[in-house]
Amino acid sequence: MAETFKHTTVLLDEAVNGLNIRSNGIYIDGTFGRGGHSRLILSHLGTDGQLLAIDRDPQAVSAASAIHDARFSIIHGPFSSLADYVAERGLVGRIDGILLDLGVSSPQLDDPERGFSFMRDGPLDMRMDPSRGVSAAEWLMNAEADDIAWVLKTFGEERFAKRIARAIVERNRVEPLTRTKALAELIAAACPIREKHKHPATRSFQAIRIYINSELDEIERALEGALQVLAPHGRLSVISFHSLEDRIVKRFIRQHSRGPQVPAGLPLTEAQLKSQGGRTLKAVGKMMPSESEVGENPRARSSVLRFAERLPA
């Protein structure tokens, strides 16, 4: 019998309440996971409401089969394609709210066979959809040291990126790295200084995972897609878990909340004057988890929830 892994949804009520759900509205849960947000959204919907859930993890899609509700449907695919899914259903401009819970889920981290965690030994995979793309082991085997170092520095902000990258390449010449424990031990040995209360492999594992799954590109495409499909006054609710994710979300909301920028002191054309009111989003707010939530679920500690509202054209 397959082992089940518990997932505690972070900022559950806050993220869903921020959608300002209408009973007959149409909503998207772009990261189904184990369905915590989806089930709560469904509880707020009336008989005419609809919820479209998306996840690229086959295990998450399988978990969605437990929801027997005519108002609910699940798509196996990346949330970066949400605009395409909406267009296929003729719902562009009719979506009343979109929720995105970014990053890796607890079941993915806790299942050693998925290869996301340095705390549990398993195959070095890290793909959110194991049926697509190359695994972390395959990439590390074929990548140059400079490329590995760039990934570790860019996506993990790892100060010892070059040392770790050289160690990985040298190890792979002797014996292929295929297990998470072996990689974690190699990284620990390559780091001359350790951060207090943080495993030395934390940043590198995050960086490799982000790269393997193109996570930051996926977020940018999903946000642009959300802007295309939201109805006037539709809400966007996004939970991020580290600074790289939150930076993208914050920048996107700020960019579309300001409207076109014209250098000060320059005369404006009639077209530019008209465009000055051309903002497409309104920043609604930002929330952090409460102390009690962090106490019950330490993984919530770094989470940030941001809201935005689609403005009428």
UniProtKB/Swiss-Prot annotation:
Enzyme nomenclature, EC number: 2.1.1.199
One GO CC annotation: cytoplasm
Reaction catalyzed: cytidine(1402) in 16S rRNA + S-adenosyl-L-methionine = N(4)-methylcytidine(1402) in 16S rRNA + S-adenosyl-L-homocysteine + H(+)
Keywords on record: Cytoplasm, Methyltransferase, rRNA processing, S-adenosyl-L-methionine, Transferase
Xref: Gene3D superfamilies: Putative methyltransferase TM0872, insert domain (1.10.150.170), Vaccinia Virus protein VP39 (3.40.50.150)
Primary localisation category: cytoplasm
Binding sites annotated in the UniProt record for S-adenosyl-L-methionine: 35-37, 55, 79, 101, 108
InterPro entries: RsmH, SAM-dep_MeTrfase_MraW_recog, SAM-dependent_MTases_sf
MF GO annotations: rRNA (cytosine-N4-)-methyltransferase activity
Location in or out of the cell: Cytoplasm
One annotated GO biological process: rRNA base methylation
HAMAP family xref list: 16SrRNA_methyltr_H
NCBIfam families listed in its UniProt record: 16S rRNA (cytosine(1402)-N(4))-methyltransferase RsmH
Role played: Specifically methylates the N4 position of cytidine in position 1402 (C1402) of 16S rRNA.
Stated family: Belongs to the methyltransferase superfamily. RsmH family.
Protein name, UniProt field: Ribosomal RNA small subunit methyltransferase H
